[in-house]
UniProtKB/Swiss-Prot annotation:
It comes from Chlorocebus aethiops (Green monkey). Binds 2 heme b groups non-covalently. Its cofactor is heme b. The chain crosses the membrane at residues 33-53, 77-98, 113-133, 178-198, 226-246, 288-308, 320-340, 347-367. The gene is MT-CYB. Belongs to the cytochrome b family. This is Cytochrome b. Heme b b566 binds at H97, H196.
Length: 380
């Protein structure tokens, strides 16, 4: 008799995606982050739903509604901190997932890669709008600075900013629409994640060697379900420790002061996971140039498949490219640090040098190094 997972139409779909899925036998723990991201997304949606039940998207009561959730709602404090720190874990997994794809050449699965970039943009937009909702000082001024960047667009910039704000300054309409979008976007992200998986299962996963694994595949369950559960336990351990022992470690103290349009904080900065892009934005003296650099810092990922000219897909056996990859990671960490510092010397200069290194490494050094490696191996 045929098992139900193979005969039932819905179960059959789940079976092909999670149970009998043919998977390369040599994929490492770096392939765990896809399932961890799915867990983070589910966690964010569940905790977000409970928070939305008590949150008030109104400038006069938003801040006090957050205080009410933390103090008065049963287990409200843990729901709030799981949501806030869950976002940080989400981005850690997201950056590691993208980093793994760059290192092992998974970006050559074009459809999967491009939907992944769209997911990254949507997640960043969702997180930014979520940062505005507590209506603290950093929420208000962060939203003011970032939305004001649209005014750099020639001709329509000012109108666009006022359209986003819903008035001549950030206020009630802005908070209301940001809450609506912050609530809706995770469901769009979930739908796009399904498309992302659909494209991945069309081609099959890449593997560390970057070679075809058609001749050596195993079923996803039980081998990789066990492996994913191990990753999940580690993630839960870190998230629980962060939430229970140091819940405000990654938050900004300024956000515990209610929003005041008449009092500017000494140093306006976004959440830690946007600091690298914020540092690139600040390193360009021209406003429009800064905005373009900001968007290009993420959009550059979409042209990486076109810049790939190595005879090997993975960097596993390419030491020169490996050096540049780790240079890129170091540059991003430097930019994250610079983004958290005030706009003064030597931080301005370090930020400009790091931004230049970031774009030069991806656009010039990596393709050149691939050509050198091809010649060293006498493959051309």
């Amino acid at each position: 008799m045929t098992p139900m997972r193979k005969s039932n139409p819905i179960m059959k779909m789940i079976n092909h995606s999670l149970i009998d899925l043919p998977t390369p036998s040599n994929i490492s723990m770096w392939w765990n982050f896809g399932s961890l991201l799915a867990f983070c997304l589910i966690l964010q949606i569940i905790t977000g739903l409970f928070l939305a039940m008590h949150y008030s998207p109104d400038t006069s009561s938003a801040f006090s509604s957050i205080a009410h959730i933390t103090r008065d709602v049963n287990h409200g404090w843990i729901i709030r901190y799981l949501h806030a720190n869950g976002a940080s874990m989400f981005f850690i997994c997201l950056f590691l997932h993208v980093g793994r794809s760059l290192y092992y050449g998974s970006f050559l699965l074009l459809k999967t890669w491009n939907t992944g970039i769209m997911l990254l943009f949507l997640t960043m937009a969702t997180a930014f709008m979520g940062y505005v909702l507590p209506w603290g000082q950093m929420s208000f001024w962060g939203a003011t600075v970032i939305t004001n960047l649209l005014s750099a667009i020639p001709y329509i910039g000012t109108d666009l900013v006022q359209w986003v704000w819903g008035g001549y300054s950030i206020g009630n309409p802005t908070l209301s629409r940001f809450f609506t979008l912050h609530f809706t976007l995770p469901f769009i992200i979930t739908a796009l994640t399904t498309v992302h998986l659909l494209f991945l299962h069309e081609t099959g996963s890449n593997n560390p060697c970057g070679i075809s694994s058609d001749s050596d595949k195993i079923t996803f369950h039980p081998y990789y379900t066990i492996k994913d559960i191990l990753g999940l336990i580690l993630l839960l351990f870190i998230l629980t420790a962060l939430t229970l022992l140091s819940p405000d470690l990654l938050n900004d103290p300024d956000n515990y002061t209610p929003a005041d349009p008449l009092n500017t904080p000494p140093h306006i900065k976004p959440e830690w996971y946007f600091l690298f892009a914020y540092a690139i934005l600040r390193s360009v003296p021209n406003k429009l140039g800064g905005v373009l650099a900001l968007f290009l810092s993420i959009l550059i990922l979409s042209i990486i498949p076109m810049l790939h000219n190595s005879k090997q897909q993975s960097m596993m056996f390419r030491p020169l490219s490996q050096f540049l990859f780790w240079l890129l990671i170091t540059t991003l960490l430097t930019l994250t640090w610079i983004g958290s510092q005030p706009v003064s010397q030597p931080f301005i200069l370090i930020g400009q040098l790091a931004s230049m290194t970031y774009f030069t490494t991806i656009l010039i050094l990596m393709p050149l190094t691939s050509l050198i490696e091809n010649n060293l191996l006498k493959w051309t």
